[in-house]
């Protein structure tokens, strides 16, 4: 999964009379810094929701917040250095602002526990992946006791869906279907930090999706460490195990009016079944996009990784997907330099990459993570060997990406317009959007336009140029559809989702009842 840094946006809390205050009687502000994968991004939405429910408001840009929360990652080797380097920079800031608090959560906090405070004693709160709901209480306790509060629990206290959330996007939302993972990949530390897989009730998931759609969201990504294992470990003991539960969930999403795009990440090749592919092919709003982690093309390395599939099985899945969804875009994850990887093993990975024709690949150089079996393997590779293989893989994958993108020149695609400028925006004034298959397209915002194009609107364009990692559409906009999400984006309004309790959802698969329509003064859907 990709590394990224995200910041909370400004959102004024309506009930300021009850807000926590600084010593000067001012409202406390916060900033959440997120490192790591999509799971962390979504957890940070929950953290923002919790803090705003507790009375904090997000700090304006360039202002020093009263509270800084780090939601950390432990997957990559440099995660520790990034965190402690940033904490070191904050030490002097905190010394100049005595009332400032710093909290560290996420996977690195879960892993390091007491080490965080030993290395950075100016940190006020350390919390883990299983108790993010405790953050407001821990902050109060740290302030009252004038000492650091460290609370790491070994198992999930409550499913994150029971926590409020402040979403980052007006048009696209993450929805967790599960937490944790039951796989035992030898390179991965996530199961020891996130715990065993626990699956949400289908009705809770669909209710959250409906709540987002009611607020204008048109695209939802179903999120889990291994989404196609969904149904094996329901948190509700009354629900029976159902290995076809994920395909049923996808079809149920197809019944939700107003939900135009559904994506999911990430599946596991060993458990990816034909019923999911059929649901993708037969449900119109399921996007023709599949992220299928390869990790290695060598069967020997896959065995050492404990991945429980082989390259032939992997390629057969792609063949079935393309037979049923010919225009599907398939992306992947690849690790280079796993302990014991030979040149022959690496060539096997290159061979699979050439056969698989991935639209894009998240490629990582292996780094040993303490606490994982692979970190103890004796045959670790020299860094220069790993770097050289990584560079060769990037050349091959980049060529494949460009060749696949070249096939789309002259085709017309529908884009969900994204926030942020397009390629070389200052010179071209291009905007950016995502096609249904997930490809990034930079387009010229001119032509048949209904007023200003906003993030969250839909446009159709014709691809005029292809690059390895994006497409360009400079022939103008053919159609422009304004949306409620676009209206919300224009005024800086993002969705919020109220707590959805594990025990309150509907036990059966199926679209929830549609909530009564709500009118927005800024809504104009054409």
UniProtKB/Swiss-Prot annotation:
Record-level GO cellular component terms: cytosol
Keyword Nucleotidyltransferase annotated: no
Cofactor(s) required for function per UniProt: [4Fe-4S] cluster
Pfam families: Radical_SAM, UPF0004
Record EC number: 2.8.4.3
Annotated residues for binding of [4Fe-4S] cluster 2: 181, 185, 188
Domain Radical SAM core stretches: 167-403
Signal sequence annotation: none
Entries under Gene3D superfamilies matching the protein: Methylthiotransferase, N-terminal domain, tm_1862 like domain
Occurrences of domain MTTase N-terminal (ranges): 28-144
PROSITE patterns given in the database record: MTTASE_N, MTTASE_RADICAL, RADICAL_SAM, TRAM
Metal-binding listed as a keyword: yes
Molecular function in Gene Ontology: 4 iron, 4 sulfur cluster binding; metal ion binding; N6-isopentenyladenosine methylthiotransferase activity
Catalytic activity: N(6)-dimethylallyladenosine(37) in tRNA + (sulfur carrier)-SH + AH2 + 2 S-adenosyl-L-methionine = 2-methylsulfanyl-N(6)-dimethylallyladenosine(37) in tRNA + (sulfur carrier)-H + 5'-deoxyadenosine + L-methionine + A + S-adenosyl-L-homocysteine + 2 H(+)
Localization, UniProt: Cytoplasm
Binding-site list for [4Fe-4S] cluster 1: 37, 73, 107
Keywords recorded for this protein, A-Z: 4Fe-4S, Cytoplasm, Iron, Iron-sulfur, Metal-binding, S-adenosyl-L-methionine, Transferase, tRNA processing
Similarity annotation: Belongs to the methylthiotransferase family. MiaB subfamily.
Function: Catalyzes the methylthiolation of N6-(dimethylallyl)adenosine (i(6)A), leading to the formation of 2-methylthio-N6-(dimethylallyl)adenosine (ms(2)i(6)A) at position 37 in tRNAs that read codons beginning with uridine.
HAMAP family: tRNA_metthiotr_MiaB
Protein name per Swiss-Prot or TrEMBL: tRNA-2-methylthio-N(6)-dimethylallyladenosine synthase
């Amino acid at each position: 999964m990709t590394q990224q840094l995200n910041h909370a946006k400004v959102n004024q809390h309506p009930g300021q009379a009850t807000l926590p205050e600084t010593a000067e009687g001012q409202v406390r502000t916060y900033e959440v810094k997120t490192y790591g994968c999509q799971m962390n991004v979504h957890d940070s939405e929950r953290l923002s929701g919790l803090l705003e429910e507790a009375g904090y408001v997000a700090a304006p840009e360039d202002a020093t917040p009263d509270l800084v929360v780090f939601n950390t990652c432990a997957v990559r080797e440099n995660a520790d250095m990034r965190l402690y380097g940033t904490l070191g920079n904050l030490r002097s800031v905190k010394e100049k602002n005595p009332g400032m608090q710093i909290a560290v959560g996420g996977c690195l906090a879960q892993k390091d526990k007491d080490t965080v405070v030993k290395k950075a004693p100016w940190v006020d709160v350390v919390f883990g992946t299983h108790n993010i709901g405790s953050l407001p209480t821990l902050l109060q306790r740290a302030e009252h006791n004038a000492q650091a509060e460290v609370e790491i629990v070994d198992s999930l206290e409550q499913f994150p869906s029971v926590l409020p959330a402040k979403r980052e996007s007006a048009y696209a939302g993450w929805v967790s279907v599960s937490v944790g993972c039951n796989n035992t990949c030898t390179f991965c530390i996530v199961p020891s930090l996130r715990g065993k897989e626990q699956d949400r009730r289908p009705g809770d998931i669909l209710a959250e999706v409906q709540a987002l759609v009611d607020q204008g969201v048109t695209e939802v990504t179903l999120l889990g460490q291994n989404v196609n294992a969904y149904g094996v470990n329901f948190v509700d003991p009354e629900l029976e195990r159902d290995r076809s539960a994920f395909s049923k969930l996808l079809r149920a999403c197809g019944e939700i009016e107003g939900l135009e795009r559904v994506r999911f990440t990430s599946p596991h090749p060993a458990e990816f079944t034909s019923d999911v592919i059929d649901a993708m092919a037969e449900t119109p709003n399921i996007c023709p996009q599949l992220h299928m982690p390869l990790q290695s093309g060598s069967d020997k390395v896959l065995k050492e990784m404990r991945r429980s599939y082989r390259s032939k099985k992997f390629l057969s899945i792609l063949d079935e997907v393309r037979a049923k969804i010919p225009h599907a875009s398939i992306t992947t994850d690849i690790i280079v330099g796993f302990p014991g990887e030979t040149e022959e093993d690496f060539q096997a990975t290159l061979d699979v990459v050439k056969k698989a024709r991935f639209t894009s690949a998240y490629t990582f150089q292996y780094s040993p993570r303490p606490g994982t079996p692979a970190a103890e393997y004796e045959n670790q590779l020299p860094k220069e060997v790993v770097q050289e293989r990584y560079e060769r893989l990037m050349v091959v994958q980049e060529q494949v990406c460009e060749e696949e993108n070249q096939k789309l020149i002259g085709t017309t695609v529908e884009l969900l317009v994204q926030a942020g400028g397009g390629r070389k925006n200052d010179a071209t004034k291009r905007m950016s959007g995502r096609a249904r298959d997930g490809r990034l397209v930079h387009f010229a915002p001119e032509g048949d336009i209904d007023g200003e194009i906003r993030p969250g609107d839909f446009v159709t364009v014709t691809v005029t140029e292809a690059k390895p990692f994006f497409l360009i559409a400079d022939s103008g906009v053919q159609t422009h559809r304004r949306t409620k999400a676009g209206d919300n984006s224009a005024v800086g309004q993002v969705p919020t989702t109220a707590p959805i309790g594990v025990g309150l959802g509907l036990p059966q698969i199926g679209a929830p009842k549609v909530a009564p329509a709500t009118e927005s003064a800024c809504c104009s859907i054409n």
